[in-house]
Amino acid sequence: MPERDITEKYLESYNDVFADIVNVLLFNGRRRVLPDDLRDTKARTLYKADGKLREQERDVSKVWAPGGTVISLIGFENQTRMDRDMPLRVLGYEGADYRNQLSAQGGLYPVVTLVLYFGEEPWTAPRSLYERVHVPEELRPFVSDHGINVFEISFLTDEQTEWFTSDFRIVADYFVQMRRNGDYVPSRRGIEHVDGVLKLLSALTRDNRFEEAQNQFREEESVTMLSVLDKVEARGIQLGRTEGIQLGRTEGIQLGRTETARNLLRMGLEPAKVAEAASLTLEEVDALRGQAG
């Protein structure tokens, strides 16, 4: 399994984070699902295609079973980009889950899938089977239209973001701010699952300096996104200096500063701080923002 796939799932696999996401997105912040009511279930299922046995794997899935009575199986699928085939993929996952229930010869329960979309553009890809597959009008009475539940994390309201009580609030706030402003103002809110948060941000933004920053904190040290970005900023400055020294020319130093500024802008640092950290003028930083946009 690719490392990025694993790191995407790490934070959401914690019961407190999983329950929090479900409570906010499905129940408008009401504490319906408790962490102790969740139990892990296998996310990988097998199916046969072209005469060969193949496997498919959900990002994260858990069984909701308060008091030992199963209410539902709930699964997450993370998306940083729109996927036109998402209704078909979700239908495949849920069909496999129901098939497993039949094989287990136990009680049957519903399957719910939440597609967590972190893109900066509204989801315009198909949200149902009918939107993806052409079904003639005369066949529609006989073909069920399977819809999917897409939650646009970057478009959550401030109220919805504040409903989160787990570390996922930090993740959601990051994407909401970056989508609205192109900048990120970090909070002083403490991070409980530091490794999980930084790995998820690294995977979703494709910037592994989030994950690298974790190694710079001492064990038991209180960590916030403010302190994380301080480490990231310092790392960016050092990388810029190193690149400039290795090139050994004025052009090399300028290139190092420019690359540092680009990296810090991608992290969401305010332009004024980027200019100061990279030894550039605010006009130069604004020009780099224009190139990125």
Regions found by a protein language model. Give the residues of each.
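Elongated, amphipathic alpha-helical interaction scaffolds
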Residues: M1-G293
